[in-house]
A protein has these predicted regions:
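Nucleotide-sugar-dependent
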Residues: 226, 281-286, 295-316, 322-332
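Conserved acidic donor-binding segment of nucleotide-sugar-dependent glycosyltransferases
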Residues: 337-345, 354-360
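Conserved donor-binding/catalytic core segment of Leloir-type glycosyltransferases
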Residues: 10, 166, 209-235, 248
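An aromatic- and histidine-rich active-site surface loop
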Residues: 47-48, 82-86, 99-135
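N-terminal subdomain of nucleotide-sugar transferases
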Residues: 1-48, 52-59, 238, 402-405
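Carbohydrate-associated surface elements
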Residues: 171, 193
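Nucleotide-activated donor-binding/catalytic signature segment of Leloir-type glycosyltransferases, i.e.
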Residues: 257-284
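Membrane-proximal helix-turn-helix segments that form the acceptor-binding/catalytic region
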Residues: 91, 110-121, 146-165
């Protein structure tokens, strides 16, 4: 008998579509593979514009999200629209087939508003803590005030509404306990372990190097706090000394146009390719071609306490890494990475060049990271934590065999 046969889990995402949100999709497919019925509510975005579709037996309901918020008014419109559609679609799904759990994924910390209504019917609320929004606000706007206090308020309300919480690392678990007031035994760490089925090592494609000897890669969001401006300054340091390195930047975000303009202004445009959001196949192909991968996240409190998916994806593809010295970045990569002095773009550039010019050391670091993922951090290990967590949420009395694929 499957572990969760007869159980229905509704997953709600506000800021990304499924299956694009890789962590959520891994969680959803793991629950489905172990017998649960799974439905997802998420926004429509480019390439994910069907109002309804079923993938791998998972029902996906997508709603319009007219704008991505900028400033107080923009965020008000975005979040109000999302809350309306989440509430409406939740009711529609509940009437079609009762769900037992709402699994809410932030940002923002507002999904509890929908969950509170269904708690009246015995539905449990699981909060999947992806981002620490007060710190995210500070990283974006660098000021405290009414909106910062609002972030803290909604975070507290989210934890109070939650029956259980999932943290992506130990730092987030401490926030759930100390700032959110949750009991320690109600918070479980489930890391965003990379899927080794998706991230397969290949020869790559030399065409991405554009005729140069080396390729340095970045994958992730392109926003203010991700430090792509710092990376471009490091690129400038490198191209002033050598012309044999190409850079590949994969991802999109609110700062993309600004970063492209900056590349032109710094005179490094011909050395940097912006690929935008790409398919998994292309992402894996580009990263497999890279000699070194980077994470230029700014040393903010948000980034210091957050585990970035890109780090473990680099490790899963056997790449050495350069990043700034942040707590959770170091906790994930350990010896797979070199750590530049925070905000020191010259030091960052020099560490990239060191790895490019010292193949043996780069390979040693890459092998360390790969072994760490294979033996400890991959989704094969994390999904067992998720299954055990959901057994507790659903009060299943006896352990059943877990499907690990």
């Amino acid at each position: 008998m499957s572990v969760f046969a007869g159980k229905h889990v509704l997953i709600v995402i506000e800021n990304l579509p499924a299956p694009f949100d890789r962590r959520v999709w891994q969680e959803a497919t793991t629950l489905k593979e172990n017998g649960a019925e799974v439905s997802i509510i998420c926004p429509k975005m480019k390439g994910y514009d069907k109002s309804y579709e079923q993938l791998n037996g998972i029902d996906i309901y997508r709603h319009p999200l007219p704008i991505e918020g900028h400033g107080a008014f923009g965020y008000l419109i975005e979040y109000s629209t999302a809350i309306f559609w989440e509430a409406w679609l939740s009711c529609k799904i509940f009437l079609k087939k009762r769900f037992h759990v709402i699994h809410g994924c932030n940002p923002p910390d507002l999904i509890f508003i929908t969950a509170l209504f269904f708690k009246l019917f015995g539905v449990k609320y699981v909060f999947d803590h992806h981002d620490i929004n007060p710190e995210l606000y500070l990283a974006k706007f660098n000021k405290k005030g009414f909106f910062y206090r609002s972030m803290l308020f909604f975070e507290r309300m989210t934890f109070r509404a939650a029956d259980f919480s999932i943290a992506t690392n130990e730092s987030y678990k401490q926030i759930a306990i100390e700032r959110g007031g949750m009991e320690a035994d109600k918070v479980t760490v489930v890391r965003s372990g990379p899927s080794l089925k998706r991230l397969r090592i290949t020869e790559g494609d030399p065409a991405y190097k554009k005729g140069r000897d080396f390729l340095v890669g970045y994958v992730g969001v392109i926003g203010v706090q991700e430090g792509l401006d710092l990376l471009l300054e490091s690129v400038k340091h490198i191209v002033q000394k050598r012309d044999d390195v190409q850079f590949a930047i994969i991802g999109s975000g609110t700062a993309l146009d600004e970063i492209k303009l900056m590349a032109e202004e710094l005179g490094v445009k011909e050395y940097v390719d912006f690929y935008g959001r790409v398919s998994d196949e292309k992402l894996v192909s580009v990263l497999n071609t890279c000699d070194v991968c980077v994470n230029p996240d700014r040393p903010t409190e948000m980034n210091n306490l957050s585990t970035m998916n890109k780090i473990m994806e680099y490790m899963a593809l056997r790449k050495s890494i350069v990043q700034y010295d942040l707590k959770e970045g170091r906790a994930s990569a350990l010896e797979a990475s070199l750590y530049a002095k925070n905000d020191d773009t010259l030091d960052f550039a020099e560490k990239i060049m060191f790895l490019l010019d010292n193949e043996e050391e780069s390979r040693r670091m890459a092998d360390f990271g790969y072994d760490r993922v294979i033996n400890k951090l991959s989704w094969d290990y994390e999904q067992v934590r998720l299954i055990d967590f959901y057994r507790e949420v659903l009060e299943l009395p006896e352990k059943a065999k877990v499907a690990v694929y």
